[in-house]
Amino acid sequence: MLILTRRVGETLVIGDEVTVTVLGIKGNQVRIGVNAPKEISIHREEIYQRIKSEKSQQNLC
């Protein structure tokens, strides 16, 4: 895992098409903005896990 430090307003670039910008920090929460092409799905981890679980259950039926 790559670990980076960024300040509010600073951006990370992933590949040629994805950027992640730190928008704000309030207590222990960090607000980030993600710019990516529409064909790239972006989910919070808990939502992604739920989607995977639902797809897995559908495949069992």
From Swiss-Prot:
InterPro entries: CsrA (IPR003751), CsrA_sf (IPR036107). SUPFAM superfamilies: CsrA-like. Keywords: Activator, Cytoplasm, Repressor, RNA-binding, Translation regulation. The keyword Transmembrane does not apply. It holds the Pfam family CsrA. It is found in: Cytoplasm. One of its GO terms (biological process) is positive regulation of translational initiation. One of its GO terms (cellular component) is cytosol. Belongs to the CsrA/RsmA family. NCBIfam families: csrA (TIGR00202), PRK01712.1 (NF002469). A key translational regulator that binds mRNA to regulate translation initiation and/or mRNA stability. Mediates global changes in gene expression, shifting from rapid growth to stress survival by linking envelope stress, the stringent response and the catabolite repression systems. Usually binds in the 5'-UTR; binding at or near the Shine-Dalgarno sequence prevents ribosome-binding, repressing translation, binding elsewhere in the 5'-UTR can activate translation and/or stabilize the mRNA. Its function is antagonized by small RNA(s). HAMAP family: CsrA. Homodimer; the beta-strands of each monomer intercalate to form a hydrophobic core, while the alpha-helices form wings that extend away from the core. This is Translational regulator CsrA. The lineage of its organism: Bacteria, Pseudomonadati, Pseudomonadota, Gammaproteobacteria, Enterobacterales.
